[in-house]
C-alpha cells in the first residue's frame, strides 16, 4: 500500500501585512490581530497612528520604503496596559561576598491593529 504525503515547503500566504518601526523595534503587523509593544503614552480604547511604515504587502503587491513608505500609516487601538514576565538578573563576583539579585518586568501596551492604509486609502 502506497502512502502519499502532502507537505509544502513554502511558507503559507499571510495576506495583508505591514512592517512598522515602533519604540526602536520592527514589528510585523496584520489587521485584526493584537500585539504587545513597549508602553505607549495613550489611554485605553484610544487610537494610535504609526507613520513609520517600512513595508506594506497587499493583494496588488509589495511596497518597500526608502526608508519609509510615503503616505502609509497603521491605526492601532489600545486594548490594555500590562506588564511582561519577570526576568531575574543575578550578578556575582567570584571569591568575594558580593551578590546582587534584581528583577525586572517590562511595561507593555497591548494594541489591536484596526487598519493599514497607503495614500489615504485603507487596504485592510
UniProtKB/Swiss-Prot annotation:
The protein, known as: Large ribosomal subunit protein bL21
Highest taxon above the source species: Bacteria
Assigned keywords, A-Z: Ribonucleoprotein, Ribosomal protein, RNA-binding, rRNA-binding
UniProt record, GO biological process: translation
One annotated GO molecular function: structural constituent of ribosome
Gene Ontology cellular component terms for the protein in this record: cytoplasm; ribonucleoprotein complex; ribosome
Organism: Synechococcus sp. (strain WH7803)
Taxonomic path: Bacteria, Bacillati, Cyanobacteriota, Cyanophyceae, Synechococcales
PROSITE patterns in the record: RIBOSOMAL_L21
Subunit structure and binding partners: Part of the 50S ribosomal subunit. Contacts protein L20.
Short name of one Pfam family: Ribosomal_L21p
Function: This protein binds to 23S rRNA in the presence of protein L20.
Family to which the UniProt record says this protein belongs: Belongs to the bacterial ribosomal protein bL21 family.
PANTHER family: 50S RIBOSOMAL PROTEIN L21 (PTHR21349), LARGE RIBOSOMAL SUBUNIT PROTEIN BL21M (PTHR21349:SF0)
Amino acid at each position: 500500500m502506497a502512502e502519499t504525503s502532502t507537505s509544502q515547503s513554502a511558507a503559507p500566504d499571510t495576506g495583508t501585512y505591514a512592517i512598522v518601526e515602533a519604540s526602536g523595534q520592527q514589528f510585523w503587523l496584520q489587521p485584526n490581530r493584537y500585539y504587545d509593544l513597549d508602553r505607549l503614552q495613550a489611554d485605553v480604547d484610544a487610537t494610535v497612528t504609526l507613520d513609520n511604515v517600512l513595508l506594506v504587502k497587499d493583494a496588488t503587491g509589495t511596497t518597500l520604503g526608502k526608508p519609509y513608505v510615503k503616505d502609509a500609516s497603521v491605526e492601532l487601538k489600545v486594548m490594555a496596559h500590562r506588564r511582561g514576565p519577570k526576568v531575574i538578573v543575578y550578578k556575582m563576583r567570584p571569591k568575594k561576598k558580593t551578590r546582587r539579585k534584581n528583577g525586572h518586568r517590562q511595561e507593555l501596551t497591548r494594541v489591536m491593529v484596526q487598519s493599514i492604509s497607503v495614500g489615504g486609502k485603507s487596504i485592510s
